[in-house]
Amino acid sequence: MAQYTPMIQQYLKVKADYKDAFLFFRLGDFYEMFFEDAVKAAHELEITLTSRDGGSSERIPMCGVPYHAAQNYIEQLIEKGYKVAICEQVEDPKTAKGVVRREVVQLITPGTMMEGRTIDEKENNFLAALTRFEDGSYALACNDLTTGQNTVTLLTGSVEDVLLEVYATGSKEIVVDSTFSQDELNKLTETLKMTVSYEEETKIPEGLEPLVKKVTQTKLVTAVGRLFNYVLRTQKRSLDHLQPVEIYYTNQFMKIDVHSKRNLELTETLRTKEKTGSLLWLLDKTKTAMGGRMLKQWMERPLIQKEKIEERLEMVETFVNDYFLREDLKEKLKEVYDLERLAGKVAYGSVNARDLLQLKRSLQQVPAILEAISLLDNSYAAKLIEGADPCEALTKLLDRSIQENPPLSVKDGDIIKDGYNEKLDEYRYISKNGKTWIAELEKREREITGIKSLKIGYNRIFGYYIEVTKANLSLLPEGRYERKQTLANAERFITDELKEKETLILEAEEKIVQLEYDLFTALREEVKVFIPKLQHLAKVISELDVLQSFATVSEEERFVKPVLTNKREIFIKDGRHPVVEKVLDGKLYVPNDCMMPENMDVFLITGPNMSGKSTYMRQLALVTIMAQIGCFVPATEAILPVFDQIFTRIGAADDLISGQSTFMVEMLEAKNAIANASERSLILFDEIGRGTSTYDGMALAQAIIEHIHDQIGAKTLFSTHYHELTVLEESLTHLKNVHVSAIEEDGKVVFLHKIQEGAADKSYGIHVAQLAELPDSLIARAKEVLAQLEGQEEITIPKRTEVKEQPERMQQPVIEEQPVIKEVAEVQQESEEIVEESQLSFFETEERMEKQEKPVLDAKETAVLAQIKKIDLLDMTPLEALNELYRLQKKLKKG
């Protein structure tokens, strides 16, 4: 390092402490980066990479960003999961001896961003800290630095359960210790897409002990200690807005695993990963940012305590029944800014005058809101607003101190109102009168000299001056004007009188700016005292906002208040999928009942694709979740039990466990339900077993149904294409067949989307293929083959005389499919021994088949033909079909 210049040595010394972050090194008006940081930053930010002399034989890579535009570049790096250390000059370069002293004043990470475009106003920005203990348990602590919220929980399940809970927090960054293995870290970084950071210290930092007063378990305190130490180490400033740690237990809420949340599209859609089209999108009628965040938290964790759910429902009913109260509340909430994050900015020291003006305007709405709620005859409302302080003293303080239209910067003056501070008023009087005197002097000088173009101006370098054009210089009295500056076409002068006033005016203006900044800083400290009250008030306002949102959407969409029962029965009359109905936008939506009395546990659902089976299943789950977060539900009547968990297997494979086949994912999710579901759970399985061969899939599907029916007793909707399973209704007393109805008109199928009792009699697979616009010739041939199969006729083909040349890619051997290819080859070899006319084919002409005589079949052949009739060819791959053909041929040959 000795060969480098002192400044580069300083850079390297600081960088050594922040190896995993980009070091923004302040040099004048730029943040500079050097060495590997420069190369990588230039690529990520798409800025110019240059170099400089650093004292060594080779030039040092360098890039930089302007100080005033740094925030944009920092956000770009944070969005990509990087960290940025801000290294500032901490002494005046004018007074520095040698290299200016520099220190890192903040480490910005994905989990500690306070503001910017990466922060969604209606989402929390959680930082998580995970601690593992010798007994295999974990403690998970989370902090949202923007709001000060802190939570902690103990996790005793599997590693997968822990990862899913971490994922559920939505954290962008997780703090661990050095005992975590590389495999575990990979799951966090690659699977959960989180930035991993390290913190070994777990002792609660000095001054933050009051925040863990209610946390008595050592494990939980350890996790919180790790979290707090990391936050303090990265932020290096006051964190007075941190709230007391809240303990939560996962068994206090309905469990919905990540796969189910995705399949049900609770907060984002499966396809676009956006809010629009999700249940959250439909329910979000909140008027405040903090209300939007609370709504999402409620949706992530539905309640399972019947009394608490009913409290929310009663409050929603109050708002539904009182239109004028609800509309008045909404109008007031529109004027309420984000109290939580404003309080955070106050504590953080980043609040400006406009923020405080927003705070004042928000607080001005609070007394009327609290008064209106206090008049309600509702115990939940009374409990909700109990202890809420409208902070009227703070409102008055801000009203008499902050100008109505202050500048964005707190260092430009014009922030504090007249009358707030006597000294400031005095300086302002001098400044204002001084400027009036300047205007009068200009008028007087014009009269004395007779120069109409004479003017008095000001600039930062020369101060005040009298400017006269060169053509008029001869008109100036001698000895009165002192030359100050010469221009191309004019001369600038100063007089003793102007010099005296200039001193007074400039001193006053400098003192005004400095005094206003000092007064604002002091005001900010006064506001800090109110932070706990503001945070409590924010929770009250947020909850009221969510409840009015439920009431608003319930009235708009014709939802009804659900009745919760302790019995294990479901009674939903005219239930609807709320999002699908909304997207249809006025088009006819077909509602469906779901009646499952206490003695009915399983609905076995059959019916064609596109008929609405999956929608019906999702509909029940969404109705259940909506009820348990305290919202009305889309139905004309609803009686529901309180479910402890929801398990779903709907749609294609889309999970956190990368690299697994569709069938493996099905089995893992089935295992999750079988291992963890109780009789108070809801299970939704769509087409379980489709990812393997027909008989394997059918056998597994039947075994799973029987296990759920006999061993678990959970309310279950199980859809299937295996129509053979419908006979289970005869042996399983708590299972009932239902189907999605359809009718045929003029050879075309019409899906009625109506759930009816009994099993489906047809699959309508060919009709679905028609809707998918498969070629007409293919559809016609499929109908032909289907008719022959249903009539138990043989299907034969002529010997092929001409084969089209296959594309080159089809001729290449596929290593993975060699076993299957071998089976196909065996089929072909054995088929040569059979009479040519009896070979099976999908290409025999109708004329030739008519000429053939129907053979007399023995019992074995009749049984095989019956099996062929049941095969759903459209639900098999070509290779699966060939394997099935091979099996049937072997069976016939054994005869």
Swiss-Prot record:
SMART domains: MUTSac (SM00534), MUTSd (SM00533). CDD domains: ABC_MutS1. One of its GO terms (molecular function) is ATP binding. The keyword DNA-binding applies. Pfam families: MutS_I (PF01624), MutS_II (PF05188), MutS_III (PF05192), MutS_IV (PF05190), MutS_V (PF00488). ATP binds at G607, P608, N609, M610, S611, G612, K613, S614. Keywords: ATP-binding, DNA damage, DNA repair, DNA-binding, Nucleotide-binding. One of its GO terms (biological process) is mismatch repair. One of its GO terms (cellular component) is cytosol. The keyword Transmembrane helix does not apply. InterPro entries: DNA_mismatch_repair_MutS (IPR005748), DNA_mismatch_repair_MutS-lik_N (IPR007695), DNA_mismatch_repair_MutS/MSH (IPR017261), DNA_mismatch_repair_MutS_C (IPR000432), DNA_mismatch_repair_MutS_clamp (IPR007861), DNA_mismatch_repair_MutS_core (IPR007696), DNA_mismatch_repair_MutS_N (IPR016151), DNA_mismatch_repair_MutS_sf (IPR036187). This protein is involved in the repair of mismatches in DNA. It is possible that it carries out the mismatch recognition step. This protein has a weak ATPase activity. Belongs to the DNA mismatch repair MutS family. This is DNA mismatch repair protein MutS. It comes from Bacillus cytotoxicus (strain DSM 22905 / CIP 110041 / 391-98 / NVH 391-98). The gene is mutS.
